[in-house]
Amino acid sequence: MTKIAVVVPTIRKESWEIFIQGWEPLFKKHRVLLVKVEDNLEWPYVETIDYGFDHIAQTFKPFPKFEWLFNKSDTCRNAGFYIAKGFNPDVYMSFDDDVLPNDNDPIQEHLDALQMTVPKHWVSTCQDIYPRGVPYGVRGEIEVVLSHGVWANVPDLDAPTQLLYPNLKDIAFNKMNVPKGVLFAFCAMNFAFKPQLLPYIYQAPMSKRLAEYGVEVGDRFGDIWAGVVAKLACDEMNLGVVTGHATINHTRASKVFVNLRKEAIFMELNEQFANEWQNDDTTNEYVLLYKKKLASWQADLAKL
């Protein structure tokens, strides 16, 4: 049976209670290791609940103060990935604490997506089948290692778009592979990946702790930029990425003006982040910090 570790960052007791009620049947079905990263104190602590046996819980309190961990943001999920690695899972998944399954099984949908092989450069214009013209020789070129899930109900939009479309619900998504050389907007509220991607899935430094390094304080790009870095790594390693195969219900709309303040600092950098990341001569202070912390993350993972 596939060993699955599910990482969930949380700061809200009420959200956690609803989350567990909605997800526990699937956690029991798939016998997952649940890794809860609680980040509402001065420093996060991590609790593991193994649904493969009885409800065995172990608490790490507080989490070790590794220099790559930035708390007080959803990038604290890095702590969960680190702890999960010690259990040697076959698949890592992560969900936000305000998402729920619909009448589906998102865990199985991710597992199915990670069994796929896909073209390196081609995409299908049809759902679940290749149309006439896609060469047979390219249809299973590369192994999928990252499944980016999507959401029903409340969409994950940036603040300016939220202001333009305040009542938007249930936007449409495509099931597709993301070809080599193409980037996409990665949202960490619902995704799964294989172990070989763990060194590159590190969620980018965010939150007020950036000020300790002389970098302007911003937020809400930790998962976006992690997605850029992970996709570039997949391209380099000839590994595949798919999106749209696993769907959850996103239940909570975030506060638009709070989001606007958090996003404003990094909006300009987001326009050029991929280029700055790939530029060996970059002088951007944030990108240099990110690269330093990513190297620290990879070094600590290698010790496990």
What annotation goes with each model-predicted range?
Residues 13, 35-42:
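Short, polar loop motifs at secondary-structure junctions
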Residues 40-88, 104-108:
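Active-site-proximal specificity loops/subdomain of glycosyltransferases
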Residues 5, 15, 159-162, 168-304:
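C-terminal catalytic/acceptor-binding lobe
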Residues 42-43, 100-104, 250-253:
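Short catalytic/ligand-binding loop motif for oxyanion handling, primarily in non-cytosolic enzymes
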Residues 1-28:
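N-proximal low-complexity "stem/linker" segments adjacent to membrane-targeting elements
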Residues 55-64, 101-209, 283:
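Conserved catalytic core of nucleotide-sugar-dependent glycosyltransferases
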Residues 95-97:
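Active-site acidic Asp-centered loop
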Residues 92:
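Short aromatic/hydrophobic "clamp" motif used to bind/position activated sugar donors
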